[in-house]
């Protein structure tokens, strides 16, 4: 896939985050782009709606701090019939991962962090971690790093996709002692998690042992959330818009 297509795909998916008050509108030509080519986007997106592949789409393209294309088609909600508007909000789930990782790499380019920095340097809640192996707690071979957060190899887990002793501790920390997690219930009613901020998350799972030695396994985890907490700490800004 060409880089331009990848960037366009990300632009479509990440609309709520790139549409910032810091951007201004301009003609495509002012930003070195083609009005003719950009005009092909709307009918292409409309076809997805007409073919029943999605109920609505919002697209935005910006270059050099100027928005040159911003359109919304279709509905936001089938049940209510609400249409997508310029300020509609979207739940994008794991598409926050490229946003968070990009923000971290910007800080890396600015010299604010190093990929092999230990996470405990920024979040002392993760200092002197233990690892639960065969029911016994052992010392971690090394403090897990920002690089390992980015690659899901830090020793963390997610808490809701498995039932290991560490997963169970995550669930108790995030949802309470007797909570039974259910994806359908979350989709219908929202999460009942007691975690409201990234700082809450760090405080909750910081004391919990690692599930495996850092750098030895790939396990889908809350590592990108922890990366977000580091970004907040370094930048002194909240991660959300």
Question: Where do the PLM segments sit?
Answer:
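Active-site SXXK
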Residues: 39-46, 65-67, 88-119, 224-235
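Boundary at the C-terminal end of the N-terminal hydrophobic targeting segment
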Residues: 18-20, 26
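Bacterial N-terminal signal peptides
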Residues: 7-16
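Active-site helix/loop module of the DD-peptidase/beta-lactamase fold
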Residues: 91-95, 109-165, 207-209, 219-222, ...
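Short, conserved catalytic-motif segment at the N-terminal edge
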Residues: 25-92, 112-114, 128-136
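Bacterial N-terminal signal peptides that target proteins for export
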Residues: 1-7
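Short, charged, amphipathic alpha-helices and their helix-cap/turn boundaries
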Residues: 71, 120-121, 164-211, 238-241
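Flexible glycine/proline-enriched surface loops and loop-helix/loop-strand junctions
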Residues: 84-88, 184-187, 206-214, 223-226
């Amino acid at each position: 896939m060409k880089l331009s297509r990848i960037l366009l795909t990300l632009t479509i998916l990440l609309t709520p985050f790139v549409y910032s008050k810091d951007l201004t509108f301009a003609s495509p030509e002012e930003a070195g782009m083609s009005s003719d080519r950009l005009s092909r986007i709307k009918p292409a997106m409309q076809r997805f709606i007409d073919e029943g592949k999605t109920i609505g789409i919002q697209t935005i393209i910006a270059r050099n701090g100027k928005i040159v294309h911003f359109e919304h088609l279709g509905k936001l909600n089938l049940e209510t019939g609400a249409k997508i508007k310029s300020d509609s909000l979207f739940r994008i789930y794991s598409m926050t991962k490229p946003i968070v990782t990009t923000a971290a790499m910007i800080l890396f380019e600015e010299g604010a962090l190093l990929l092999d920095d230990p996470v405990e340097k920024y979040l002392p809640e993760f200092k002197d971690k233990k690892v639960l192996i065969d029911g016994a707690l052992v010392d971690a071979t090394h403090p897990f790093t920002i690089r390992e957060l980015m690659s899901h190899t830090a020793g963390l887990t997610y808490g809701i996709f498995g039932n290991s002793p560490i997963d169970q501790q995550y669930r108790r920390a995030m949802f309470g002692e007797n909570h039974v997690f259910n994806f359908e219930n979350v989709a219908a009613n929202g999460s009942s998690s007691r975690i409201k901020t990234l700082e809450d998350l760090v405080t909750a799972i910081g004391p919990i042992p690692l599930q495996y030695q850092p750098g030895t396994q790939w396990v889908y985890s809350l590592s990108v959330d922890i990366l977000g907490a580091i970004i907040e700490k370094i930048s002194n800004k909240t991660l959300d818009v």
